[in-house]
Each structure stands twice: as structure tokens, then as C-alpha cells.
A protein has these predicted regions:
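Short alpha-helical interface segments
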Residues: 2-14, 20-28, 33, 37-106
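Conserved short histidine dyad/triad with adjacent acidic residue
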Residues: 117, 130-162, 189-195
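Short glycine/proline-enriched turns and hinge-like loops at secondary-structure junctions
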Residues: 143-144, 161-163, 180-182, 201-202
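Glycine- and acidic-residue-biased ligand/ion/polar-headgroup-sensing regions
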Residues: 152-155, 161-177
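Short acidic-glycine-tyrosine-enriched beta hairpin
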Residues: 177-197
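Alpha-helical membrane-targeting segments
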Residues: 218-232
């Protein structure tokens, strides 16, 4: 199935297979908290994504309705009671735990409201670049982090690549990179295989919601020095 993104928003700029996978994992509760929050905002902005998410949620609900109850054997029930009584929980690592959703940061409709995000408290990193942290620690070497990034109109970002994945949702303004223009409502997906230097569109500061798995990898020595201080 493919999604046709025809709406007042600009066309979605990452491969549809990536979007479909993200939405399906969102509907199934398989996304990490930061990814979950970002996709939730994208769904609020884009009616096509919202429709696809609703479809996947309905399919999941239908599958659950078709599950037939199975009687449990006394032996199984006894084993469960024994575990509860003597405090030996099953420590099974599960990256697909639906409880991730419960732990996700609250996604306010304010994040997709231009006036609200422009009037948030921002921490200046360098002239023309500011950040508003939402989840995680940008200065740690590893670990998912979610933040709002605001960059002045017309500014060119330093050339960089990534450690792991970066998901970005444009909330205001836009930028150009690799021959493409990303504007409000667009999702942009990057990883360590690509190096780029986005240029912010003229006329309006660019604000995006960004999820990264680790700090950016700057290509030049001066941005590297600055990064050690400000973190991003």
C-alpha cells in the first residue's frame, strides 16, 4: 500500500516505505518514546498520515476481536501464581513493549501550533540557532533524544553527518538540502550514510521537531569545538 500525500502541506519527502513502516509501528505501539511523539505530531499535521494511522489501528483492533479465548490449564495458572507469590518476575527484554507509549512524553497540540512554538523558551546555542529540549540529553554520546530546533532564515547549517538515525518533522519555515525543499508537515529521514549542509529558506525561521540517536558528527574543526560546549 502506498500513501499519496496530497494536502495543503507539501509532499512528504522521505520514501513512502519508511513512512508506512513508522506509522504501522506507531499504531502497534512499537516505537520508542521519542519516535512515538514525533510521529504523533506528524499525524496531527498531515491528514493522509492520520488516515493511514487510523486504518492500521482499525486493522489491529479487528485482529484482536478475532482472537478466540483459550482456557488455561491449572498447571499454567499455578505457575503464574507461584511467580507472583515468591517474587520471581520474568525479566524478558522486549523492545516492542506497548508500555513505551505510556512512557512517551505528552504530545500537545501546541507543538503543531506556530504561535505556541515561536513563543516557547529557547536556549541559544550559537547566534541564529536555538533549542528547546523535550526528552533525553543532547550532550551524551548515546541515547535517543527529542528536541525542538530553531534556525534563523537564510542560515546555512554546518556540514555534518549522523550517528544512527535522525527523524525531523518541519513545524515552521523550511530548508533546502540535496536538491529538495522541506516545509511544514514534511518528514525528513537521515542516517550515518549521508553528509549534508541544510540551507534555511528565506522569509521565516525554520523550526523542526528532531529525534536523534546520538550527537551530530561535524565535518569541520570549528563546529566540532563549538559542539563540545553547546551539544547537539
Amino acid at each position: 500500500m502506498s500513501i499519496q500525500a496530497h494536502s495543503p502541506l507539501s509532499d512528504i519527502q522521505i520514501p513512502m516505505s519508511e513512512i508506512e513502516t513508522a506509522i504501522m509501528n506507531y499504531a502497534a505501539g512499537k516505537l520508542t518514546p521519542a519516535r512515538h511523539a514525533l510521529i504523533a505530531c506528524a499525524i496531527e499535521l498531515n491528514p493522509d498520515l492520520a488516515e493511514f494511522a487510523a486504518l492500521n489501528t482499525s486493522v489491529a483492533a479487528s485482529l484482536l476481536d478475532e482472537v478466540k479465548p483459550v482456557s488455561l490449564s491449572p498447571l499454567f495458572i499455578g505457575k503464574v501464581l507461584e511467580t507472583l507469590s515468591f517474587g520471581h518476575p520474568y525479566d524478558v527484554a522486549n523492545d516492542h513493549n506497548p508500555k513505551r507509549i505510556m512512557n512517551a512524553p505528552p504530545v500537545s497540540k501546541g507543538l503543531v501550533n506556530r504561535d505556541v512554538i515561536k513563543n516557547m523558551s529557547w536556549k541559544s546555542l550559537i547566534p541564529g540557532v536555538a533549542v528547546h529540549d523535550l526528552l533525553g540529553n543532547r550532550k551524551t554520546k548515546n541515547g535517543e533524544r527529542l528536541y525542538l530546533l530553531k534556525v534563523k532564515a537564510g542560515m546555512r547549517m554546518p556540514e555534518h553527518t549522523h550517528q544512527g538515525e535522525e527523524w525531523a518533522l518541519i513545524l515552521s519555515g523550511g530548508y533546502r538540502v540535496d536538491g529538495k525543499t522541506y516545509r511544514r508537515g514534511d518528514l525528513h529521514f537521515e542516517n550515518e550514510t549521508n553528509s549534508h549542509s541544510p540551507v534555511i529558506c528565506e522569509g521565516e525561521d525554520c523550526i523542526c521537531l528532531a529525534m536523534t540517536e546520538a550527537p551530530l558528527v561535524m565535518k569541520n574543526w570549528l563546529p566540532k569545538l563549538i559542539q563540545r560546549v553547546v551539544g547537539i
